[in-house]
């Protein structure tokens, strides 16, 4: 089984061909192909890392942009009546790994 550890959206993800990964927002349109930065490649018993990864390419296709779950931020100060409520939804991108070469 071939898999790679790639850096995508500020995090490291373990991916193999056909996997769908959700990462922080990546620029591009739906259907575009992007290159992910490989950190480690495992092919059966053979492990590749460091300078040997210069030839390794991990390609992924942008499936769709989406948003994460809504979180609520509350601020409160005692005895003053100060209350502040704010929401946030992280922008994400769903990627499908198409090739590890």
Swiss-Prot record:
Protein name: Large ribosomal subunit protein bL21
Organism of provenance: Beutenbergia cavernae (strain ATCC BAA-8 / DSM 12333 / CCUG 43141 / JCM 11478 / NBRC 16432 / NCIMB 13614 / HKI 0122)
Similarity field: Belongs to the bacterial ribosomal protein bL21 family.
Record gene name: rplU
SUBUNIT field: Part of the 50S ribosomal subunit. Contacts protein L20.
Short name of one Pfam family: Ribosomal_L21p
Entry GO MF terms: rRNA binding; structural constituent of ribosome
Ribosomal protein is among the record's keywords: yes
Entry's Gene Ontology BP terms: translation
A single GO cellular-component term on record: cytoplasm
SUPFAM superfamilies reported in the protein's UniProt record: L21p-like
Record bears the keyword Ribosomal protein: yes
Annotated NCBIfam families: L21
Entry function: This protein binds to 23S rRNA in the presence of protein L20.
Entry keyword set: Ribonucleoprotein, Ribosomal protein, RNA-binding, rRNA-binding
């Amino acid at each position: 089984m071939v898999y790679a550890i790639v850096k995508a959206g500020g995090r490291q993800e373990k991916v193999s061909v056909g996997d769908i990964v959700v990462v922080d927002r990546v620029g591009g349109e739906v259907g575009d192909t992007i290159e992910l930065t490989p950190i480690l490649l495992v092919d059966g018993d053979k492990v590749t890392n460091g300078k040997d990864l210069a030839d390794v390419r991990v390609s992924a296709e942008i499936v769709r942009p989406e948003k994460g779950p809504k979180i609520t931020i509350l601020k409160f100060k005692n005895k003053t009546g100060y209350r502040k409520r704010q929401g946030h939804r992280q922008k994400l991108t769903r990627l499908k790994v198409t090739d590890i070469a």
